[in-house]
Amino acid sequence: MASVLVLVTTSCFLIHCKQKKDIQVPRTVIEDNTTYLIQDSILIQTRDGVKIHAIVVRNSKITKPNPAILFHTIYSRKSDLQKAKMAADHGYVGVISYTRGKGLSPDSIVPFKKEATDTYDVIEWISRQEWSDQKVGMYGGSYVGFVQWASVKHGVHPALKTIVPSVSVAPGIAEPMENGVHQNFHFPWHHYVSNNKYLDTTLYSNGQRWQDLNMKWYGEGVAYNKMDSLDGLPNPQFNERLLHPTYDAYWQSMMPYKEEFSHIDIPVLSTTGYYDGGQTGTRYYLNEHTKYNKDAAHYLVIGPYTHFGAQGKPNTHILGYDIDPAAQIDITGLIFEWFDHILKGKKKPSLLKDKINYEVMGANKWGHAPSLEQMANDTLTYYLSSKRSGVAFKSTYDSGNNGENVHFSLEERPSDPKGYLEQTIDFLDRSNFTWNSSGWGSIIADNLTIGQGFSFVTEPFTSDFEINGSFGGEMSVSINKKDFDYSVALYEQTPDGKFFALTLPYVGRASYVLNREKRQLLRPNIKTKIPFGIVRMTSKKIGKGSRLVVVVNGIKDPFTEINYGSGKPVSEENMTDATPPLVITWYSDSHIDIPVKKNKIYLSMATLCK
């Protein structure tokens, strides 16, 4: 700790004064014939007196002021020096800074809540260093993506010239809940980042512990906010967040909210994937930025990538699917091409031919559009019919479709608008294989998992076309309770009977879909129209002879907060709220709207028969 920064006098915070010399004498390190100047024990004092640990790496050959690349993260690792060196290798000053309390910071660890001002203050500090030319770019994914948006909440620092958020977390929107539904994998995350100054990898990596906890919570039926009591290790951050099920001031204070997006006038490059859990966050920021700033220079790159693949170099094989050669791009390389363009005036990356840049799965090509809406030139609308299609399929558990492995029909017009299918979910039954799980573990599969829900299928298509964008529509339902959680998944069923998952399933809580800031309970046994919240987008060539399949289902499983429908705060509900069983009536005027890009000839067999 001898090399830790000694701060200047208390009357002059670092964020307000230009220092005459480096606050920590750089040490010289030679690697691969490159000489680096490294400061790895810097403490930056924020406006409220907290100290932020930072690392700075420069190439000794660069003697004039230079742009800096900032990576501000909660995931403090001893190996982060390499990330700063990578920026230096690209001709920049590499800066790593950590969430308050992390690394060498002596303060308490505070995830999320102070990043807006702390990151701004780090940028201010960078801009006042002798090696800085007052140009800063930021990049990084997941939490680090959120941090970049937080940094511009109260205004864009004059030195900040661009942000490159990947697979961005959006607290209160896309984590720890998605469209109102909490998911259990967030529970151990708080221990991971808050148990020590770096990361509690040992505890976090104990998959058996978290699996056992999920099963114990599910089996005993205790309230969601008692999960840490079952675990035996207090989790105050997890419980604090459960006190805010709506998108209230607690969440709004963390990142830009509504009109605050209007002042974000720097170029933005976002990256995400069709199979990225963080796509909902990326989509939220894109939607809000372009809504409140009509001139937003916001670019998107999206392809068949997972959460980690969309941050760096995607794997060529993901979840049973070999991605197209065209999709096998170096996203890290693209990011630094972008920095060269914005910070050094070089040519814009060739991939960015328009604002929205997307890889069309199965077509081995990239598409480009000025906006999300312009990715498609038509919409397919299908209604969830209660009539059988006659199309049999292989079911994973033989548990849905009222016990028969035959799809119901997706109709282009509702033949019986008053028709319906009824689903009963018994929350008291926690026996094995009663999980109401629908979804998939492999993008391409022989079987379809529908839980106790229902699957619906189109007629086979007579020509190729592209699905481009996010499906919409509305569910027409009635329930015997006041609320429920549900999922909707979209697949291509190929002529050989295989199922291709087009993106991750949509999940939503009915009482929050209309207004995430105010819960609106359903009236029992009254038919209600429920629109969709944020739906992940996709792009894929749908081949001639293929069909589209939609799976709808209520949610009851060991990995997701259980909404018993009593109307009480869901995190407080327990097995005493389980009766009566939830009865969901899915009406046949429910419809799914699917954005497509078609050529002149585009008809399904059903259309030809009209």
Regions found by a protein language model. Give the residues of each.
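Short beta-strand/loop motif that positions the catalytic acidic residue
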Residues: 264, 270-272
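Accessory cap/linker subdomain of secreted extracellular hydrolases
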Residues: 89, 152-262
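N-terminal cap/lid segment of alpha/beta-hydrolase-fold proteins
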Residues: 26-62, 461-463
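Proline/glycine-enriched tight loop/beta-turn segments at coil->beta junctions
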Residues: 50-52, 60-68, 132, 263-264
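C-terminal, loop-rich substrate-recognition/catalytic regions characterized by aromatic stacking residues
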Residues: 218, 317-610
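Short beta-strand element of the alpha/beta-hydrolase
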Residues: 55, 64-74, 548
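Gly/Ser-rich "nucleophile elbow"/oxyanion-hole loop immediately N-terminal to the catalytic nucleophile
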Residues: 60-65, 108-115, 121-142
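Short amphipathic alpha-helix adjacent to the substrate-entry channel of hydrolases
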Residues: 79-95, 287
